[in-house]
Structures are given as C-alpha cells and as structure tokens.
Amino acid sequence: MGIYENNIIDGKAAAADLLGRLKVVMEGLKEEHGLFPSLVVIIVGDDPASRLYVGNKQRKAEELGINSKTIALPYETTQEELLGIIQELNEDENVHGILVQLPLPKHIDKILIINAIDPEKDVDGFHNANAGKLLTGEMDCMVPCTPQGCIYLIKKVMPVLSSKRAVVIGRSNIVGKPVALLLMYENCTVSILHSATANIEEHCRDAEIIIAAVGKARMVKSEWVSPGAVVIDVGINLITSESKNRFVGDVDFESVRDKVAAITPVPGGVGPMTIAFLLVNTVLGACRQKGIKQYKNIKSSVLQ
C-alpha cells in the first residue's frame, strides 16, 4: 500500500518515505561537515505508555543513524535535579536535541521544565521562544512535531491549501493552536472549535479540512463531515472491553472513511509522523547549532 490508497492516508508509509530522504541528507552532512546529530530523551517515572513512546523514538533514531540516549529517572526525582540535568545537556555541544517526555509527575512544573531547555535544542518546539516565533510567522524555529506531521499528510492528498476552509477541533498548545497557525500560513481560512463552540457539527460540515485533536473517542461522526473532506485524526483514546482493549481516534473512522476524500487511521496515521518530525527537528537543530547555513535547503529537500 502506498501513502494514499482507498481513502486512507498511511502515516507509517509517509514517515518511512520522509525518513528515507532525511537519511540521505544525513549521510551528506556526515561526509561534508562531520555532523553526527545527537538526541537525548528524559523520562521521569514508570508510565507504561511513556516508556513505549520513548522506546519507539529511540529505535527510529538509531535506525536513521542519530545518536540517541534515554535518561530514565525515578518518579521521586526532584524538580531541581531535573533542572540540573537539563542544564548539563544545554551546555553539552555534542547534544543537539533535548526532549522531556510528558506527562511529568505532579510535583514537577511542566512549563518551568520546558522553558529550561535551550530553545535551539527544544526538538518538541514547546519552549516559549519557539512558540512566540511561530505565532509571529518566524518559521526559523523549532516547530511542534505533530502539527508539522498533520500539514505534511494533508499536502500528500491536497497539495494546494490556499483558500481552503479548515477546522481544528481542540485548542491545546501542543497541537490545536500551532496546527491552526500552520494552516493559516498556508492561506487557509481557519476556525478553532472547542468546548464552548455552538453548532460544532455545522462548522465541521462546512470544512474542507478537519483536524480532530480533542481527546474524545469517536466524537466526529459521519453526519459531521462533507463529502470530499480531508480528515486528520490526532486523537488516541483507549477503549476497554471484556474481549480486548484497543485505541481509537477522535473520529468515528468506520462511518466517516467512505464519505471523505481522505482520512488518517488510529493507530498508524499521525503518530508515526510525530516521531519522524522529531528526528527532522533534531537534524535541523544540529545544523543550526553547527552553523551549517544550507539547513533551510535541507528542510525543503526532506519535506518535498
């Protein structure tokens, strides 16, 4: 199956295609500049889902040739201890990307930790400095990974986004707000829908692009979407039953898929793209930190 077949956008195939191009670029950077990008992921506590995510990130990084290290800390780690580790990594010229896996234990201030990371090494793109640059349209910054993945997948089936009507369901700092900005920079007409939005179904029916990132299982129904729409499902919700547990998205996939032009599945849609863009950010961050000026051209060649 290719990236797009039978109305389904295959995020795994899209990520593999993107990472294949990134690997070629990395080989050139190693030969020409002696650049070996390095990523450090910090995880605090024993959350099984977080450990699974971190394992997937490290495996993909190693497959690509990125030096990847995981620092696993006990739940009892203090905020001061975590800040100290981050400061050491900030000062280490051989570390190009730092990621603190969320969620963090309640006794640690997430915002403080995110903003302790050097913005140039903030591969998640969550630091206030990066968020501020994105808000003002200064794209020479770390852009959050999942929003980048959403736009990449949309463009695989809808190459020209200018003038398209788009809705984003959800207004989080991680997905909703940044993906709305990216759509706006593509000259879409964007509406952000949330818990206080009246007639949410009507807004969705009027949209040519729907991005669901609200964390409510199967919220978007068939009657919410118009024929020919492109639907990107960011949600991942655990459904438990006596027979088995499984993950579903924010979109009722089975009822929606035959009505729309394209839809991402859960799992296997946006998730692989998030990891792919984490690695893209790591390589681009390494280029910036090492003063490799053609990194903008590198980004264009990877994202073609």
Swiss-Prot record:
Which Pfam families does the entry mention?
Answer: THF_DHG_CYH, THF_DHG_CYH_C
Q: Give the pathway listed in the UniProt entry for this protein.
A: One-carbon metabolism; tetrahydrofolate interconversion
Where does the chain bind NADP(+)? G170, R171, S172, S195, I236
Recorded GO MF terms: methenyltetrahydrofolate cyclohydrolase activity; methylenetetrahydrofolate dehydrogenase (NADP+) activity
**Enzymatic reactions:** (6R)-5,10-methylene-5,6,7,8-tetrahydrofolate + NADP(+) = (6R)-5,10-methenyltetrahydrofolate + NADPH; (6R)-5,10-methenyltetrahydrofolate + H2O = (6R)-10-formyltetrahydrofolate + H(+)
Keyword vocabulary terms for this entry: Amino-acid biosynthesis, Histidine biosynthesis, Hydrolase, Methionine biosynthesis, Multifunctional enzyme, NADP, One-carbon metabolism, Oxidoreductase, Purine biosynthesis
> Which GO biological process categories is it annotated with?
L-histidine biosynthetic process; methionine biosynthetic process; purine nucleotide biosynthetic process; tetrahydrofolate interconversion
Question: What quaternary arrangement does the UniProt entry report?
Answer: Homodimer.
Family per record: Belongs to the tetrahydrofolate dehydrogenase/cyclohydrolase family.
Stored HAMAP family: THF_DHG_CYH (MF_01576)
In its UniProt entry, what is this protein called?
Answer: Bifunctional protein FolD
